[in-house]
Swiss-Prot record:
UniProt-annotated location(s): Nucleus; Cytoplasm
Chain positions with Phosphoserine modification: S373
The species this protein was found in: Homo sapiens
Positions annotated to bind DNA: K136, K140, K143, R154
Gene3D superfamilies according to UniProt: SAND domain-like
Lineage of source species: Eukaryota, Metazoa, Chordata, Craniata, Vertebrata
GO biological process: regulation of transcription by RNA polymerase II; transcription by RNA polymerase II
Linked residues for Glycyl lysine isopeptide (Lys-Gly) (interchain with G-Cter in SUMO1): K155
GO cellular component, one term: nucleoplasm
UniProt name for this protein: Glucocorticoid modulatory element-binding protein 2
Keyword presence, Zinc: yes
Keywords: Coiled coil, Cytoplasm, DNA-binding, Isopeptide bond, Metal-binding, Nucleus, Phosphoprotein, Transcription, Transcription regulation, Ubl conjugation, Zinc
SUPFAM superfamilies attached to this UniProt entry: SAND domain-like
Subunit structure, interactors included: Homodimer, and heterodimer of GMEB1 and GMEB2. GMEB1 and GMEB2 form the parvovirus initiator complex (PIF). Interacts with the glucocorticoid receptor (NR3C1). May interact with CREB-binding protein (CBP).
Record domain SAND: where: 81-163
Length: 530
């Protein structure tokens, strides 16, 4: 379906000069008002470019404004005054949805999307901001969202009726269109002839405002291609098909596109991206409607990145959990180690210095408990406390040597008797009990008198070296073979016919009576001599 022709009826542009008014308090530049009238029919009093001058511009414009009864629209044009020079500023009324604004053409430079050239509520904003404020930001192309007299701005610009300001001098190379204009009616409105007079009519139109027909052929989306071309365009391509050249043209197109994309792919491998490559990509995306493919690639990459981020987050959480577990186990092991160290410290015996023994007087010790406790402390030698009564020697086994001498003295062999008056004599007031004749310890200890009350009997009975006795007045302690059945108060009998005997005081010479006690200091094991 061909697009119907768009007929634009225009009139001459008349500049109206008004008294200078300051924009702000400083009064740097003046603002003048220009009325541009657009009528459906010409009016009387035609004005030409040759006879229009600055002096009669106001009167001519006023006459044209008052004489026209079919005035449809007035376009406000501002003129800036700097010194004596006057420069006209064209303002086009534009709409976007329900919002209305003015497009300042002198500021409308290429590419125009982010250039502040739209006057909206006393503010100068960019077309992109104007589209967002109008609520049309969902549209892909801002030129389709903005309209002039109900016609999309893209169609007007593609037809050549409107172009960027000084586009032949200032171009960003991102505005080139691949549309084919077969009608030849490409007219630019961007070349004013003078500072006071700006023609708004096409080149084919007369100066009196006669209507001119302009065919606008454009397309935006691939879905609109079949319905957006004109009959002439369709006839052109059908002629190529009938001539058999369409296949060759398509093949050339394909080869050119392949080579272009191959070169583009090779160039984008080396950073940075060149400007011409960015322009090429932008044109391909816009003209072939591939913006959805770009969005699809971005969405896929974003989804992949989100999955990777979630996986990394899970792995990090697992590692943090393992670290916490290891820290907890380390704390437990440290606590157990400290506890074991404390237990070992409590179990370790503390070496204390041995207490200093003070010399004391001999005291009788009753009961065999002391002897038994001393017997258990040493296996080879047994040290017993002094003052043990003779009847309590029953707990002392035979075959041992009992003496009041220290063990260090007994280990030296024969003993030397200290002086009888020595106060430190270990035999003073004590007894020495030796083994019987059946013992293997003959002549272990010699008997020495150490006090006036100690009497040594005749040694004639002990010449064999196996019998030793000690006499202390008024008691006598005998260890003689074969005397056990004849002595009184038998305390203990041995299988070898040896007897430890206590004799009462009445049976021994001496005036005094004493309790018979024996001080036992050390004992030696029987098997050490074997």
């Amino acid at each position: 379906m061909a697009t119907p022709d768009v007929s634009v009826h225009m009139e001459e542009v008349v500049v109206v000069t008004t008294p200078d008014t300051a924009v702000d308090g400083s009064g740097v530049e003046g603002v003048k008002t220009v009325l541009v009238t657009t009528n459906l029919a010409p009016h009387g009093g035609d004005l030409t470019e040759d006879n229009m001058e600055t002096e009669n511009a106001a009167a001519a414009a006023a006459a044209a404004f008052t004489a026209s009864s079919q005035l449809k629209e007035a376009v406000l044009v501002k003129m800036a005054e700097e010194g004596e020079n006057l420069e006209a500023e064209i303002v086009y009324p534009i709409t976007c949805g329900d919002s209305r604004a003015n497009l300042i053409w002198r500021k409308f430079v290429c590419p125009g999307i982010n250039v502040k050239c739209v006057q909206y509520d006393e503010h100068v904003i960019s077309p992109k901001e104007f589209v967002h404020l109008a609520g049309k930001s969902t549209l892909k192309d801002w030129k389709r969202a903005i309209r002039m007299n109900g016609i999309m701005l893209r169609k007007i610009m593609d037809s050549g009726e409107l172009d960027f300001y000084q586009h032949d001098k200032v171009c960003s190379n991102t505005c080139r269109s691949t549309k084919i204009d077969l009608s030849g009616a490409r007219v630019s409105l961007s070349s004013p002839t003078s500072a006071e007079y700006i023609p708004l009519t096409p080149a084919a139109a007369d100066v009196n405002g006669s209507p001119a027909t302009i065919t606008i052929e454009t397309c935006e989306d691939p879905g609109d291609w079949t319905a957006a071309i004109g009959d002439d365009t369709f006839t052109f391509w059908r002629g190529l098909k009938d001539a058999g050249l369409l296949d060759e043209v398509i093949q050339e197109f394909h080869q050119e596109l392949v080579e272009t994309m191959r070169g583009l792919q090779q160039r984008v491998q080396d950073p940075p991206l060149q400007l011409r490559d960015a322009v090429l990509l932008n044109n391909i995306v816009q003209n072939f409607g591939m913006l959805d493919l770009v969005k699809k690639v971005l969405a896929s990459h974003k989804c992949q990145m989100d999955r990777s981020r979630e996986q990394y987050a899970r792995d990090l959480a697992a590692l943090e959990q393992q670290c916490d577990e290891h820290r907890r186990r380390a704390k437990e092991l440290k606590h157990k180690s400290q506890h074991l160290s404390n237990v070992l410290m409590t179990l370790t015996p503390v070496s204390l210095p041995p207490p200093v023994k003070r010399p004391r007087l001999a005291r009788a010790t009753s009961g065999p408990a002391a002897m038994a406790s001393q017997v258990l402390t040493q296996s080879a030698q047994l040290a017993l406390g002094p003052g043990v009564p003779v009847p309590q020697l029953t707990s002392v086994p035979l075959g041992k040597v009992v003496s009041t001498l220290p063990s260090t003295v007994l280990g030296k062999g024969s003993l030397q008797a200290p002086p009888a008056s020595s106060p430190a004599s270990p035999l003073l007031g004590g007894y020495t009990v030796l083994a019987s004749s059946g013992s293997t310890y003959p002549s272990t200890v010699e008997i020495h008198p150490d006090a006036s009350s100690l009497t040594v009997l005749s040694t004639a009975a002990v010449q064999d070296g196996s019998t030793v006795f000690k006499v202390v007045s008024p008691l006598q302690l005998l260890t003689l073979p074969g005397l056990g059945p004849t002595l009184q108060n038998v305390a203990q009998a041995s299988p070898g016919s040896s007897t430890i005997v206590t004799v009462p005081a009445g049976a021994a010479p001496g005036p005094e009576e004493h309790t018979a006690t024996i001080e036992v200091a050390a004992m030696a094991e029987d098997h050490e001599r074997k």
